[in-house]
């Protein structure tokens, strides 16, 4: 199972780094920061499906 450490988030601003992750909502997040912010907003219901595009 793929996992991402979101302990340093949320962050007010994310970089434009392009390292896509696919969320359990079948949405592509451009990088870990964007994904982690979304995870925290979802109260933990969003999880990582896999690294790379969906």
Curated annotation (Swiss-Prot):
Q: Which UniProt keywords apply?
A: Disulfide bond, Glycoprotein, Protease inhibitor, Repeat, Secreted, Serine protease inhibitor
Top-level taxon of the source organism: Eukaryota
Tell me a Gene Ontology molecular-function term this record carries: serine-type endopeptidase inhibitor activity
Query: Which stretches make up the Kazal-like domain?
Result: 4-54
Against InterPro entries, the record matches this protein to:
Bifunctional_prot_inhibitor (IPR051597), Kazal_dom (IPR002350), Kazal_dom_sf (IPR036058)
**Know the name of this protein?**
Ovomucoid
Which cysteines pair up through disulfides? They are 6-36, 14-33, 22-54
Q: Report the CDD domains cross-referenced here.
A: KAZAL_FS
> Mind telling me which residues the site (Reactive bond 3) is annotated on?
16-17
The record's annotation in SMART domains points to: KAZAL (SM00280)
Q: Which organism is it from?
A: Argusianus argus (Great argus)
Q: Which residues are glycosylated?
A: 43
Record's SUPFAM superfamilies? Kazal-type serine protease inhibitors (SSF100895)
Compartments it resides in: Secreted
Q: Which residues cross the membrane?
A: none
A GO CC term attached to the entry:
extracellular space
Q: Which Gene3D superfamilies match?
A: 3.30.60.30
Domain remarks: Avian ovomucoid consists of three homologous, tandem Kazal family inhibitory domains.
């Amino acid at each position: 199972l793929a996992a991402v450490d979101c302990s340093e988030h949320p962050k007010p601003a994310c970089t434009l780094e392009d390292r896509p992750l696919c969320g359990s909502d079948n949405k592509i997040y451009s990088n870990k920061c964007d994904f982690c912010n979304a995870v925290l907003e979802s109260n933990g219901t969003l999880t990582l499906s896999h690294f790379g595009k969906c």
